[in-house]
């Protein structure tokens, strides 16, 4: 006797009723890039078609469209006019992301604004903090990250997302926020972030490529599974409210491993290189793009992700509304 498993696949309605993993637009976070400019700017990135550097008005228009589609959250990255060795623009109370957060919350009070907390977009060397002897100083970087986090919390950001991969960054930030009265501001930590070649196109849009070396001394080795789990569990211990794995496609084993060891919400970042690959395949008619897109996003959830940060968020929202 054998089990006839095909019985439960015999019709579309039966398959739909028994589907274990379902996509919902509430799962998605849309990353947005705001550029400091006195002009109206909306620059499409050649390596990421459909992704733009936007000044304030186009950014607000994009938020309006996302809200109309049911997207509940955006993740902001800033592109300043001025960069220097210490990323001092990020410590200005009127810096580009702080201003954008204020404007978004004025117009769309229910839209969740998440701010990336790092210095690579603000430093002239493209590394994620203060340099000492051509290396990023962990503890000095924590000091300025805390200041940046406080400015963003004061500007009305709903969630802070430290992406710097400095040791102790979650505990240090949590203490700073709590001492300033921001006890209800959650931290979504980039808890397991790999030193990955999949980030290539992001550095085009954020103008954040390192001017020398790489980030392997602070971002994780992609060969390591146990260390990946340790990083996220350590951030949970330090007080992270949400954990994250970045990148996504080649790291679903890591997502599953962390999911099995934590009860915290788990985000996954579907990064620029992954986005660009699907877009290139679409351009050359190599795949059924919409089917592959929905399959990919469903597999992210099946692996254990509760939230999906993706440049495809708007496309997925449109597809889910149609279907």
Swiss-Prot record:
Per UniProt, 5-aminolevulinate 1 binds at 203, 215
Entry annotation: catalytic residues: 193 (schiff-base intermediate with substrate), 246 (schiff-base intermediate with substrate)
Which NCBIfam families does its entry note? Answer: PRK09283.1 (NF006762)
What cellular component GO annotations does this protein have? cytosol
EC number(s) given by UniProt: 4.2.1.24
Identify the gene encoding this protein.
hemB
Endoplasmic reticulum among keywords: no
Q: Which UniProt keywords apply?
A: Heme biosynthesis, Lyase, Magnesium, Metal-binding, Porphyrin biosynthesis, Zinc
Where along the chain is 5-aminolevulinate 2 bound? 272, 311
Q: Name one GO molecular function term.
A: zinc ion binding
Source organism per entry reads Helicobacter pylori (strain ATCC 700392 / 26695) (Campylobacter pylori)
Q: How does it assemble?
A: Homooctamer.
**Keyword tRNA-binding, does the record have it?**
no
The cofactors named for this UniProt entry are: Zn(2+)
Catalytic activity line of the entry:
2 5-aminolevulinate = porphobilinogen + 2 H2O + H(+)
Q: Where does Mg(2+) bind?
A: 231
Quote the function comment for this protein: Catalyzes an early step in the biosynthesis of tetrapyrroles. Binds two molecules of 5-aminolevulinate per subunit, each at a distinct site, and catalyzes their condensation to form porphobilinogen.
Q: Which GO terms describe its biological process?
A: heme biosynthetic process; protoporphyrinogen IX biosynthetic process
Cofactor notes: Binds 1 zinc ion per monomer.
In the record, the note on similarity to other proteins reads: Belongs to the ALAD family.
Highest rank taxon of the organism? Bacteria
Residues recorded as binding Zn(2+), renumbered to this chain, are 118, 120, 128
Recorded protein name is Delta-aminolevulinic acid dehydratase
| This protein's pathway | Porphyrin-containing compound metabolism; protoporphyrin-IX biosynthesis; coproporphyrinogen-III from 5-aminolevulinate: step 1/4
């Amino acid at each position: 006797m054998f089990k006839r498993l095909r019985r439960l696949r015999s019709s579309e309605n039966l398959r739909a009723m028994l589907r274990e993993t379902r996509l919902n637009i509430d799962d998605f976070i849309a990353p947005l890039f705001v550029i400091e400019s006195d002009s109206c700017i909306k620059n499409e990135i050649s390596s990421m078609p459909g992704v733009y550097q936007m000044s304030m008005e186009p950014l607000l228009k994009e938020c309006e469209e996302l809200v109309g589609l049911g997207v509940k959250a955006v993740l902001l990255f800033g592109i300043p006019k001025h960069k220097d060795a210490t990323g001092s623009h990020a410590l200005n109370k009127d810096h580009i992301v702080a201003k954008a957060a204020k404007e978004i919350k004025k117009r769309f009070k229910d839209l969740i604004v998440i701010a990336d907390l790092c210095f690579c977009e603000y430093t002239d060397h493209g590394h994620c903090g203060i340099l000492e002897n051509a290396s990023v100083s962990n503890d000095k970087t924590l000091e300025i990250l805390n200041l940046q986090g406080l400015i963003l919390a004061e500007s009305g950001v709903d969630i802070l997302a430290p992406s710097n991969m400095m040791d102790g960054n979650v505990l240090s930030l949590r203490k700073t926020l709590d001492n300033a009265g921001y006890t209800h501001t959650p931290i979504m930590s980039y808890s397991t972030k790999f030193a990955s070649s999949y980030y290539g196109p992001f550095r085009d849009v954020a103008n954040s490529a390192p001017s020398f070396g790489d980030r392997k001394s602070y971002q994780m080795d992609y060969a390591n599974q146990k260390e990946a789990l340790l990083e996220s569990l350590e951030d949970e211990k330090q007080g992270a409210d949400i954990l994250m794995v970045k990148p996504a496609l080649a790291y679903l084993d890591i997502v599953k491993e962390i999911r099995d060891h934590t009860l915290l919400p788990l985000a996954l970042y579907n990064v620029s290189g992954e986005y660009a690959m699907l877009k290139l395949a679409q351009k050359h008619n190599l795949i059924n793009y919409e089917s592959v897109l929905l399959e990919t996003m469903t597999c992210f959830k099946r692996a254990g992700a509760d939230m999906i940060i993706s440049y495809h968020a708007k496309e997925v929202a449109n597809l889910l509304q149609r279907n």
